[in-house]
Each structure stands twice: as structure tokens, then as C-alpha cells.
């Protein structure tokens, strides 16, 4: 892994809107967050193994970009490393960039629903 940050993206979020807008969104994220390892989900459930793989490759920050389901999958993948957590070993920080239809999790966590503002918040976070 070349980068400390992995972004797991559900391109079908918001009914495929994210896939359509990705050529505009990616440069904003790269500029705001710096170099990223980007992994795209292909089907429901992919977020979990992609998060697990990011940890195994040494990611220090794993971000979920999509809807609440994508965030849940990615968080579940990170939580599979309970052995590392129990041993007191470092596990990656987790963040979200809301891009789904409802944005409920983003609202609950106080994460801006605007993609650029959410990325700026991640960039300023202590876990970076």
C-alpha cells in the first residue's frame, strides 16, 4: 500500500449519482485529503472485505463514501480485527464522507453532507 488513507467508495450510492459525478469529485478529494488508495465496491457486502484488506495493507485511516449501508459494511470490516484491538495494537481510524440518499449517519455524527466540507472535516481530524 502506497498511502496511509484508504477510501472505500460505493459508486452506486444515491442511485448511481456518485459514479456519474466521480470525475468531478475525485480531484476534490485528492486535493483535500492528499494521496488516497481508492477501492470501489462492486456489490452489496464488498465494503467489509475491502476494509479488512485496507487494514492488512497498513492503512491508518479508512474512509467510507456512500450511504449508511456502505459505512456500516466498512465499520464491520474494521471490527473484525478484535484480536488487534484486544492486544492493544493500533487499528485504523474510521471516517465517513456521506454520499447516500438519506445521510442519517452523517447527520447523527455531525458530518457535513456536502462532500467537500466532509472531506475538509476529515482532513482536520486528530486521527489524521
Regions found by a protein language model. Give the residues of each.
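Glycine-rich beta-strand-to-loop/alpha-helix junction loops that act as flexible
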Residues: 11, 65-67, 97-99
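Catalytic core of DAGKc-family lipid kinases
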Residues: 31-32, 41, 79-128
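Short, active-site-adjacent cap segments at secondary-structure transitions
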Residues: 70-72, 104
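Positions that flank functional sites
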Residues: 44, 69, 121
Amino acid at each position: 500500500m502506497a498511502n496511509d488513507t484508504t477510501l472505500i467508495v460505493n459508486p452506486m450510492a444515491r442511485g448511481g449519482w456518485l459514479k456519474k459525478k466521480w470525475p468531478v469529485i475525485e480531484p476534490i478529494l485528492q486535493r483535500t485529503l492528499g494521496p488516497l488508495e481508492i477501492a470501489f465496491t462492486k456489490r452489496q457486502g464488498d465494503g467489509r472485505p475491502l476494509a479488512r484488506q485496507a487494514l492488512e495493507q497498513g492503512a491508518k485511516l479508512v474512509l467510507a463514501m456512500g450511504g449508511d449501508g456502505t459505512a456500516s459494511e466498512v465499520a464491520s470490516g474494521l471490527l473484525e480485527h478484535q484480536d488487534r484491538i484486544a492486544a492493544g495494537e493500533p487499528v485504523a481510524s474510521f471516517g465517513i464522507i456521506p454520499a447516500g440518499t438519506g445521510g442519517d449517519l452523517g447527520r447523527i455524527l455531525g458530518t457535513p453532507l456536502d462532500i467537500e466540507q466532509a472531506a475538509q472535516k476529515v482532513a482536520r481530524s486528530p486521527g489524521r
